[in-house]
Design a protein with these regions (language model features):
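Localized chelating/binding microdomains
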Residues: 51, 62-63, 73, 139-141, ...
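Short coil/turn motifs that cap or connect alpha-helices
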Residues: 169, 184, 217, 232-235
Length: 240
């Protein structure tokens, strides 16, 4: 079973999926084993941990023998991601949390598991992760992110559309994205399309409707992108 909270800048899942394929995506992870430890592979390193932060765009997989995990995915352009990089990762591919922090997160989940929203808030507050960081984005990049947030879909001509809205050439806008927040615009658009697909699935409960509304060519394209980005099939994600 998978319980999911969708916020625009992050996702929290209580998952029971097992052995996802090795994959990478633009989100930063926090993965916490609820019923025991995790078996992790990150950037080619195999290790066991109880909880781990994983940087953006790093090949990884993690699973628990019990199957039950808390899985956070933080948008790499968000203030949460900025704080995680600044306070925990320090440029590394991953960092494991100490036992005291893990036990506190587990206890917070147990205390709030009847409300995933309350659990999310309590855990982020405990880790001192705040939206109110001193992250500074180029104003044109910030405008693009706002425009994308307001769109229901990511169209095929999204780059041209965004360039027109912010009065920049393709090369200039792509350069700004690569410079700040440090990711490829085309890859971010693919991530954004995936996110909108999940949002529409939550809203309509139908993969065909979700795929079409998000801008995918077909439901199979949506499902294949899910498998590639997250290492699990869409059917595994939707089991509940």
């Amino acid at each position: 079973m998978t319980d999911t909270l969708f916020e625009y800048d992050h996702i929290l899942m209580r998952s029971e999926y097992r052995t996802p394929d090795i994959h990478s995506h633009l989100a930063l992870h926090l993965i916490v084993g609820l019923g025991g430890g995790l078996h992790c592979t990150v950037a080619g390193d195999n290790f066991d941990a109880n909880a781990v932060f994983i940087a953006s765009d790093i090949l990884h997989t993690a699973y628990s023998d019990s199957g039950e995990m808390l899985v956070f995915l933080f948008d790499s352009t968000s203030r949460y991601a900025y704080e995680i990089n600044r306070r925990f990762l320090h440029g590394d591919s991953h960092v494991c949390l100490d036992s005291d922090r893990v036990q506190k997160i587990r206890s917070l989940w147990k205390a709030h598991q009847d409300s995933i929203c309350n659990a999310d808030r309590a855990i982020l507050e405990y880790l001192c992760l705040s939206k109110n960081s001193d992250l500074q984005l180029d104003e044109r990049v910030a405008e693009v992110l706002t425009i994308l947030k307001e769109l229901d879909e990511v169209p095929d001509d999204a780059v041209n559309y965004l360039c027109g809205r912010v009065c920049l050439s393709k090369s200039r806008l792509s350069h700004l994205f690569k410079e700040n927040p440090g990711i490829s615009l085309s890859r971010y658009l693919a991530w954004e399309k995936m996110r909108k697909g999940y949002i529409h699935f939550q809203r309509y409960g139908n993969i065909t409707e979700a795929a079409m509304r998000a801008g995918f060519d077909s439901p199979s394209h949506f499902a294949a992108t899910c498998k590639r980005m997250f290492g699990i099939s869409f059917s595994e994600y939707t089991k509940s």
